[in-house]
């Protein structure tokens, strides 16, 4: 949901309730996502404080957040699957999007094969992340294989679209309006009807400085990843400025080097004249 409106794929079988094919060029396909949050959005402060993003595991944290945002249904529910050396498989009991987690492995590449003919490859699997198995129709068989013939124990989950919609609508209710974007600046405004946490889908990395209503503002890291700050009710203007870390030091060193070079050349010219 985080500001990713379009995705590229190498096949024409990625459409589903959350993704629509909008363009094609050769073997490259452009899809538009249905639920896309803007660059910034508000979250109730109580939700932000209660969400245990670090202690519930990849799936548990997402289910907890959806619940805090108002859903009375699990966002992701485990389904029956089977794993053996070189292959994991399951049969989709419902038409839905499916995801999978797995135990630590040294395998780097996995290949998904769906009985409908759709395929998908996963790389750098040893880094550990949630596998997006895509949209499957009820009755389709899904296999995830590896050429190393290693046991990769998958746990497969079904996405509940109603829970997703509830969470999305809660976050999209108070969204920012971006008025200016450049390589070093993002400006906009937000109408806050309920005080809470403004969260930007921008990584909280060195180099960013936040201004709210013209004043430099200390930001916080939300979810261990994103820039955020607390806002009161009312209309606020914001600006995020970016300056590459070490830029000033580098500029001083460069200037000093230029001055040293100039002084050296001037000295050489004087010696030649003498």
Where are these regions (language model features)?
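Conserved luminal/periplasmic juxtamembrane motif of membrane-embedded glycan-processing enzymes
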Residues: 1-86, 106-119, 126-150
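Active-site-proximal, structured, solvent-exposed surfaces of multi-pass membrane proteins
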Residues: 71-274
